[in-house]
Amino acid sequence: MEENMEEGQTQKGCFECCIKCLGGIPYASLIATILLYAGVALFCGCGHEALSGTVNILQTYFEMARTAGDTLDVFTMIDIFKYVIYGIAAAFFVYGILLMVEGFFTTGAIKDLYGDFKITTCGRCVSAWFIMLTYLFMLAWLGVTAFTSLPVYMYFNVWTICRNTTLVEGANLCLDLRQFGIVTIGEEKKICTVSENFLRMCESTELNMTFHLFIVALAGAGAAVIAMVHYLMVLSANWAYVKDACRMQKYEDIKSKEEQELHDIHSTRSKERLNAYT
């Protein structure tokens, strides 16, 4: 009988511990973090592969080659974009962890008005700093989304030219890289529908794959923007809750101090009456 009671108490203690742990999870921050990681992964992974596919298309079908020396050509720019992608992946991996940790501390402080993190002035400054930083990152991701739409537009034009070539017989269309600013005005890098390279490019799966990779990268950038907006809502709500918790804590401190003073006054009067009676 005693063993069954002990087992029941143990199970009850484990259940209460699990409920307490689940109650301390910042679900809103968790959803935003998952969305951020998914968006950054799609943008960085698909963007990197799309840039590599662009290099292969330029070298294979447009017969472009890397210039010797330190000249800033399209291939150098693509390499720079790849390094930027590496930095974005690492930076936002760390930033997502920081926001999750901040969410855990904030949730714990809201559950307990006398927590040690968000009730302090330093904790409130950290929350305000995260709000400002997340807002700046949201603006940055909006710029990244707008910039990522440019290659999508370029590849859509190329895909449209290839499609029109197959639909309209005898169409003589040309694709000039100078229209997109990829090469300088003095260079003439264009292919027309009558050339073999153009037909090979349109029939290859590489063009279609690169086009869709850029579309997925654009979707990933949009998901990162949504994650930043979600983070802003979560951080702003946490800031409001923490501010109310601070006010409540000050009120409780003042109330307890007044009660202690009243208790001391009553104790002093009781002692005086007792001394006067004796």
Swiss-Prot record:
A biological-process GO annotation: synapse assembly
Residue ranges annotated as Cytoplasmic topological domain: 1-22, 106-127, 235-278
Membrane topology: Multi-pass membrane protein
Post-translational modification: N-glycosylated.
Record text on subunit structure and interactions: Interacts with OPRM1. Interacts with palmitoyltransferase ZDHHC17/HIP14; the interaction leads to palmitoylation of GPM6A.
Impact reported for residue 192 to A: Impairs synaptic density in primary hippocampal neurons
Stated role: Involved in neuronal differentiation, including differentiation and migration of neuronal stem cells. Plays a role in neuronal plasticity and is involved in neurite and filopodia outgrowth, filopodia motility and probably synapse formation. Gpm6a-induced filopodia formation involves mitogen-activated protein kinase (MAPK) and Src signaling pathways. May be involved in neuronal NGF-dependent Ca(2+) influx. May be involved in regulation of endocytosis and intracellular trafficking of G-protein-coupled receptors (GPCRs); enhances internalization and recycling of mu-type opioid receptor.
Extracellular side: 44-84, 149-213
Entry-listed glycosylation sites: 164, 208
Gene Ontology annotations for the cellular component aspect, listed alphabetically: axonal growth cone; dendritic spine; filopodium; glutamatergic synapse; neuron projection; neuronal cell body; parallel fiber to Purkinje cell synapse; plasma membrane
Localisation: Cell membrane; Cell projection, Axon; Cell projection, Growth cone; Cell projection, Dendritic spine
Name used for this protein in its record: Neuronal membrane glycoprotein M6-a
Gene name for this UniProt entry: Gpm6a
